Amino acid sequence: MIYQMQMPERIEVDEATHSESIGQFVAQPLERGYGVTLGNAMRRVLLASLPGTAITGIKIDGVFHEFSTIDGVREDVPEIVLNLKKVRFKSTTKRSCKTSLSIEGPADFKAGDIVAQEGEFEVLNKDMHIATLNGDAKLNIDIYIGRGRGYVPAEENRGEGMPIGFIAIDSIFTPIKNVKFSVENTRVGQRTDYEKMILDVETDGSISPDDSISLAGKVINEHVSLFANFSPTEEEFAEEEYKQQDDEFENMRKLLQTRIEDLDLSVRSHNCLRLAEIDTLGDLVSRKEDELLTYKNFGKKSLTELKEQLDKCELKFGMDITKYQMKS
């Protein structure tokens, strides 16, 4: 009897704690060991492989490197950069964009002041503090926003064609703020050695917890399906086919080179073929039946005997053996 693996029929959702950004999901029952297997895979993909939107760089008038200070602004450039990394976006497009701001003091520069020029994005944490400007301060800043996955260091955001004074920053694209899982024992009938995997997900609000686990599951499935549907590539098929054809060709060539005296034939048939200068199977199969019957002392009984021998070798009279470079 084939053992049927225990699998969950559906994913359970904890409705009591569910919200637009927080979700708890339960998968049960699972075979022992599968709680950690699935939990680890989901956690890694959720944190590193989901697409999101983040700031990739900035340009501030009068600032030419990231270790500068700005007159009339309490925070220095490194502090401003750290604050901008924390700004979370919900994007309406997959393309990169730039927005320009001009802020005059006194002012408290917040994430909500970052406005899309063509509605490409929405800032989610609008109250996030960016910088404090004194009464005579003025801040002109270009903010570059892009799409990506996981975490991308500043070095990778330094693309060609950027203006002088462009400051690339680390981008945290992942829309997942936190994800953890735990594994507990669960009962199925009289057995208590099955597992229950509990997955807790918190997003930044740009994607729902439900959509995030669905997308993560699809990413995993796309990779696992490569193994489930594994078969040799077309090139491997072609190579194997050519090899098989080469082997068949060589085997046939050797068979056609078989000497007539090595066949289990009567003395009469041997003598008839020898007198007709038919020395190999290749010589024999290149002849037609009518031609053989014209040879001296060669009758229908001998023809039947030869047919039986050729049938055993899967050969027949009247074959074209020129491609095997056989002497007919």
UniProtKB/Swiss-Prot annotation:
Gene3D superfamilies associated with the record: 5' to 3' exonuclease, C-terminal subdomain, DNA-directed RNA polymerase, insert domain, RNA polymerase, RBP11-like subunit
Domain of life: Bacteria
InterPro entries given in the database record: DNA-dir_RNA_pol_insert, DNA-dir_RNA_pol_RpoA/D/Rpb3, DNA-dir_RpoA, RBP11-like, RNAP_asu_C, RNApol_insert_sf
Biological processes per GO annotation: DNA-templated transcription
Keywords: DNA-directed RNA polymerase, Nucleotidyltransferase, Transcription, Transferase
Keyword Transcription: yes
A Gene Ontology cellular-component term: DNA-directed RNA polymerase complex
Keyword presence, Transcription: yes
EC number: 2.7.7.6
Catalyses which reaction(s): RNA(n) + a ribonucleoside 5'-triphosphate = RNA(n+1) + diphosphate
CDD domains: RNAP_alpha_NTD
Pfam families tied to this protein: RNA_pol_A_bac, RNA_pol_A_CTD, RNA_pol_L
Chain segments carrying region Alpha N-terminal domain (alpha-NTD): 1-231
Region (Alpha C-terminal domain (alpha-CTD)): 252-328
GO terms of molecular function: DNA binding; DNA-directed RNA polymerase activity; protein dimerization activity
Subunit structure: Homodimer. The RNAP catalytic core consists of 2 alpha, 1 beta, 1 beta' and 1 omega subunit. When a sigma factor is associated with the core the holoenzyme is formed, which can initiate transcription.
NCBIfam families hit by this protein: PRK05182.1-2 (NF003513), PRK05182.2-2 (NF003516), PRK05182.2-5 (NF003519), rpoA (TIGR02027)
Family that this chain belongs to: Belongs to the RNA polymerase alpha chain family.
Protein's job: DNA-dependent RNA polymerase catalyzes the transcription of DNA into RNA using the four ribonucleoside triphosphates as substrates.
Domain notes: The N-terminal domain is essential for RNAP assembly and basal transcription, whereas the C-terminal domain is involved in interaction with transcriptional regulators and with upstream promoter elements.
Identification of the protein by name: DNA-directed RNA polymerase subunit alpha
Organism for this UniProt entry: Prosthecochloris aestuarii (strain DSM 271 / SK 413)
Upper classification of the organism: Bacteria, Pseudomonadati, Chlorobiota, Chlorobiia, Chlorobiales
Gene expressing this chain: rpoA
